Amino acid sequence: MSEVPRVALLGADLILSSRLRSALAARGVALVAAPKDDRLPDVSLVFVDLNSDTEARLEAIGRLRLRHGGAMIVGFCDHADRDLRRRAMAAGASQVVANRRLPDAALRLAAVDGTVR
């Protein structure tokens, strides 16, 4: 039996994680969520919620980049928070998307990554 492709989420927002989980599940991709980066599995696509606990999540991006150098690390936050987007990129994020674009971005990036067939 083949393993279900997985995408990871570092965050605790139930509404955003539910939206992300639903979008990915429709394409046969499982979302593995964890409140701390040391609990995330080794996957090639990681989403990081920058809407809360911002400083800790920025530090987590740096640790994730060190541990999973080739992973696509995607932060998400309010579209107007340009400074946070810049800081996330400086910390090692591959890109940062607006909250409202999260489900679409997840499907697009999972397809590029090869997670979605």
Regions found by a protein language model. Give the residues of each.
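Conserved phosphotransfer microenvironments
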Residues: 47-64
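Conserved phosphotransfer cores of two-component systems
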Residues: 65-69
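Output/docking surface of receiver
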Residues: 92-104
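N-terminal first-folded block
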Residues: 5-45
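Non-catalytic signal-transmission and effector/linker regions of two-component phosphorelay proteins
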Residues: 1-6, 111-117
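Short beta-strand/turn micro-motifs composed of small residues
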Residues: 10-11, 48-50, 77
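Alpha4 helix (beta4-alpha4-beta5 surface) of REC/receiver domains from two-component response regulators
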Residues: 80-94
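Short beta-strand elements of ligand-binding domains
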Residues: 72-78
